[in-house]
Amino acid sequence: MELFFITSNDGKVREAKKFLEPLGINVIKKPLEYPEIQADTLEDVVVFGLNWLKDKVDKPFIIEDSGLFIEALNGFPGVYSAYVYKTIGLDGILKLMEGIENRKAYFKSVIGFYDGEIHLFVGEVRGRISNEKRGLHGFGYDPIFVPDGFDKTFAEMSTEEKNSVSHRGKALKEFYRWMKENLKK
C-alpha cells in the first residue's frame, strides 16, 4: 500500500517509515502546501487540513501537527509552535524561560489519516525544558526538550530511542495498531 505523508519535513517522514514499513506500507513524502488555520486545538488544525486536502490527493494520506506546551508560559507556544519556532526559535524560548523554575512541558502530536473518512491518532509525552540546547539529532524543539525519565534531550537520542517515547512515536503507534487491524479487512 502507498501512503502519502503531506509534509516537507524529512524528519517526520523518517519517523513514520520506521513504524509503517513493517506493515508493507510505503510512506511517500508529498510536500503539498495547505493552510494551517489558527485554532484552539491541534485536532481542529488537523481536521481542517484533511478536509482541505481530501479532494486534491488521490491516495490515502496522513498529515501531522504537533505542539510544545510549556506550563509556566500558560501552554505557549502550543498550537503556534511552528510559527514560534520560525520567528524566535530555540534561543527565544530559552530566553523566555530564563529565571523560571517550573520547566514542565509536554509535546502533543495529532496524526490525521484520510481514506474516505477522517481518523485521528493522538500522542503525548511529558517532560521539561532544558537550560540550554543539547544534541545534534532530530529537529524543531528536540534540542531543548527532556522527556520524563531521561536526562537527555530528544536531540541527544537516536531515532529509535526517541520514537519509543515521543509524542509522534505514540501517535504513530496508535496509527500502526489501527492500520494493522484495518488492513486485514
Swiss-Prot record:
Binding site for substrate: T7, S8, N9, D10, G11, K12, S66, F139, G140, Y141, D142, K162, H167, R168
The EC number(s) this enzyme carries: 3.6.1.66
Cofactor: Mg(2+)
Gene Ontology CC entries for this record: cytoplasm
Function per UniProt: Pyrophosphatase that catalyzes the hydrolysis of nucleoside triphosphates to their monophosphate derivatives, with a high preference for the non-canonical purine nucleotides XTP (xanthosine triphosphate), dITP (deoxyinosine triphosphate) and ITP. Seems to function as a house-cleaning enzyme that removes non-canonical purine nucleotides from the nucleotide pool, thus preventing their incorporation into DNA/RNA and avoiding chromosomal lesions.
Subunit structure and binding partners: Homodimer.
Name of the protein this chain belongs to: dITP/XTP pyrophosphatase
Organism: Pyrococcus furiosus (strain ATCC 43587 / DSM 3638 / JCM 8422 / Vc1)
Lineage: Archaea, Methanobacteriati, Methanobacteriota, Thermococci, Thermococcales
